[in-house]
């Protein structure tokens, strides 16, 4: 560390693809709901265009791409329908990202922890209830809390504000762990260093994007590696 550098004090985790390996379930649920509206979404399109977006933004994008009108009432219905389907899927196929439980427990002994996600709060709570990680997080920012989706930095800035209300912390002292390009853009715009996981994109697709580190997974890594970012 160079004198004057900020030491890491907190770690902010994205949720889907970082803590829980559920992007396939989100993709499946979105595909099914859109199919009922006669809109086709391929898996390739999901990972290229929709990964990292909250459900509201995703449906707006899908209807815009299909040149279809989406009313506020229909949008609300589709978000609820997709969330219900996701919860049904994840109940029978929940899988945490490799190394996530151990990493979170270790990180919690060294840093303040938070979740910043485009998922709905009830989805986050449901998954945390199925694990023993729920008490690890001081701050949780979900899609319900925000009007702007990543890559807008608002959700990461909201997490920083929430930390500050409890005990002051510099934004630069918050390290983000993400798996999506919009998430990386949001973290950088918030002034936070970002570690990228290759859960959803190959390492070569993340090169030159401004990530502080690129890891294949959380397994085999120590939270202490974040101390000097």
Language-model regions, residue ranges each:
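Asp-based, Mg2+/Mn2+-dependent phosphohydrolase catalytic module
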Residues: 1-9, 101, 105, 121, ...
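N-terminal helical cap/lid subdomain that shapes the substrate entry/recognition surface
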Residues: 5-101, 105, 109
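Conserved G/P- and acidic residue-centered "switch" motifs that form tight phosphate/ATP-binding loops
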Residues: 14, 18, 117, 179
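Short, flexible loop segments at the rims of nucleotide/cofactor-binding pockets, characterized by
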Residues: 90-94, 118, 191-194
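Glycine-centered short loops/turns at secondary-structure junctions
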Residues: 110-111, 191
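Thiol/selenol-based redox catalytic cores and closely related redox-interacting motifs
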Residues: 114
């Amino acid at each position: 560390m160079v004198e004057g550098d900020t030491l890491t004090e907190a770690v902010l985790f994205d949720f889907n693809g970082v803590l829980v390996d559920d992007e396939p379930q989100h993709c499946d649920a979105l595909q099914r709901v859109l199919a009922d509206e006669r809109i086709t979404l391929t898996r390739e399109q999901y990972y290229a265009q929709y990964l990292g977006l909250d459900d509201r933004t995703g449906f707006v994008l899908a209807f815009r791409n299909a040149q279809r009108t989406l009313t506020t009432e229909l949008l609300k219905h589709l978000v609820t329908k997709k969330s219900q389907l996701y919860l049904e899927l994840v109940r029978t196929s929940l899988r945490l990202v490799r190394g996530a439980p151990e990493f979170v427990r270790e990180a919690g002994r060294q840093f303040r922890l938070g979740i910043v996600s485009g998922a709905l709060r009830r989805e986050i709570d449901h998954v945390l209830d199925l694990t023993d990680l729920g008490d690890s997080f001081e701050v949780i920012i979900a899609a319900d809390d925000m009007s702007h989706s990543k890559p807008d930095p608002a959700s990461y800035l909201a997490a920083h504000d929430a930390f500050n209300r409890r005990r002051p912390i510099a934004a630069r002292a918050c390290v983000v762990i993400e798996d999506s390009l919009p998430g990386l853009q949001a973290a950088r715009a918030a002034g936070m260093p970002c570690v990228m996981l290759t859960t959803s994109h190959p390492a070569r697709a993340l090169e030159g994007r401004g990530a502080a580190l690129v890891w294949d997974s959380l397994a085999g890594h120590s939270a202490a590696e974040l101390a000097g970012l």
